[in-house]
Amino acid sequence: MGAETAVDILFVEDNPFDVDLTLRTLRACHMGDRVQVARDGKEALDFLFGAGKYEGRRLEEGPRLVLLDLKLPKMTGLQVLQWVRADSRTKDLPVIVLTSFEDDREVVEIFRLGVSGYLVKPLNKDEFCDLAHKLGVEGARAN
């Protein structure tokens, strides 16, 4: 795999409606060109670490940012975040958690685990663009 298969953003979301809305926000922030969507937590980890159907994929090909829903099939977003932070290759990878509700205990837990940011769905374009820009993700600017 080479530059043509590089990915800027791994978007982990199982709800097709939320996928569509968030991809629109990414495009509005000039970040929608190289996005990989994973539909569950296991697929996200397989993509990151080159396992399963992504066997042979190298982490050097991206992503530079993970957008992570908390309520996922097969493995929760919290479990994915734990795996990402526990691995030396991904411990510093920016992760923004996206969720459709605010649960104070969950918010405390994701920050304890080292999340880079937290946004409530549906995404506010300006808030997302600002946070992505602060995390150093290129192209993160609003129209």
Language-model segment annotations:
Residues 4, 20-24, 79, 102-117, ...:
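Alpha4 helix (beta4-alpha4-beta5 surface) of REC/receiver domains from two-component response regulators
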Residues 6-17, 22-27, 66:
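Conserved acidic segment of CheY-like receiver
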Residues 23, 37-65:
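Acidic, metal-coordinating helix/loop segments flanking the phosphotransfer/catalytic sites
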Residues 37, 72-75:
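Residue-level signal for the "D+5" position in two-component response regulator receiver
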Residues 40, 61, 76-82:
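Acidic catalytic/metal-coordinating carboxylates
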Residues 53-56, 78-91:
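Short amphipathic alpha-helix used as the core "switch/output" element in two-component signaling
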Residues 68-70, 99:
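Active-site residues of response regulator receiver
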Residues 121:
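A Lys-centered signature of the CheY-like receiver
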